């Protein structure tokens, strides 16, 4: 298995990488659709729709397809998004849970003094509470949401911002994610990238996006990142 040396910073996606959040996202999206008298959505559908941020998720729910309806009414879209945000917040994210090995692996990187960040397309307002709720907020020096900057993944803007802030060369940063947006962002930033097979990638294998390494379990990251003694 390939091993990365000289890694000084690790950036993580959130949904589908650290956290299985589909049940809560699907519930909020379904409630929003019901409130508007639209067709309901299922967990199975939402699993293939997430990864591009809440606006796109709700657009897909309204369109009942991964392809957005080009004639979708803007006012309806905005109302649906506001309802989704309300229901998602009111639900308290109680059905979401960390994947196996996440907390232990993050703790190991933290113990090895490797700074870490969250780079997610999820709206930033929801991220701090989720990290605190699952006891991992202390591990991250930066938390970047999908609306923190004007551009989100697959654009590399957030990764470039982190490299500039922490004075990193691209070869010193590692991105960990479960979708092609994560892989494309890392490749555009020319940093290393690991793709995880268990997350949400629009129903496609993550290997198709050609990450440097493909892993089936989060805990395997310890085997590919060479930690200082």
From Swiss-Prot:
Names of required cofactors: Mg(2+)
Q: Which CDD domains match?
A: HAD_PGPase (cd16417)
Q: Tell me any Pfam family this protein matches.
A: HAD_2
The pathway this protein participates in, as annotated, is:
Organic acid metabolism; glycolate biosynthesis; glycolate from 2-phosphoglycolate: step 1/1
Gene Ontology biological-process entries: carbohydrate metabolic process; DNA repair; glycolate biosynthetic process
GO cellular component annotations, sorted alphabetically? Answer: cytosol
Q: Which UniProt keywords apply?
A: Carbohydrate metabolism, Hydrolase, Magnesium, Metal-binding
Record-given protein name: Phosphoglycolate phosphatase
Species this protein is from: Photobacterium profundum (strain SS9)
């Amino acid at each position: 298995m390939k091993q990365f040396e000289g890694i000084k910073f690790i950036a993580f996606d959130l949904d589908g990488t650290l956290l299985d959040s589909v049940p809560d996202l699907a519930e909020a999206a379904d409630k929003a659709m019901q409130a508007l008298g639209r067709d309901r959505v299922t967990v199975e559908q939402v699993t293939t729709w997430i990864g591009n941020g809440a606006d796109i998720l709700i657009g897909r729910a309204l369109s009942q397809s991964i392809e957005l309806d080009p004639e979708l009414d803007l006012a309806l879209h905005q109302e649906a998004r506001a309802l989704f945000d309300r229901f998602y917040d009111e639900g308290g994210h109680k059905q979401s849970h960390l994947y196996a090995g996440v907390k232990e692996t993050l703790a190991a990187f933290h113990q090895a003094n490797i700074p870490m960040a969250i780079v997610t397309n999820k709206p930033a307002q929801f991220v701090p509470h989720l990290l605190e709720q699952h006891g991992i907020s202390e591990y991250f020096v930066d938390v970047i949401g999908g609306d923190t900057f004007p551009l989100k993944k697959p654009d590399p803007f957030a990764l470039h911002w982190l490299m500039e802030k922490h004075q990193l060369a691209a070869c010193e940063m590692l991105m960990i994610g479960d979708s092609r947006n994560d892989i494309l962002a890392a490749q555009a930033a020319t940093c290393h990238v690991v793709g995880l097979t268990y997350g949400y990638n629009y129903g496609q294998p993550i290997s198709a996006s050609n990450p440097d390494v493909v892993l089936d379990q989060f805990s395997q990251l310890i085997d590919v990142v060479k930690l200082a003694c």
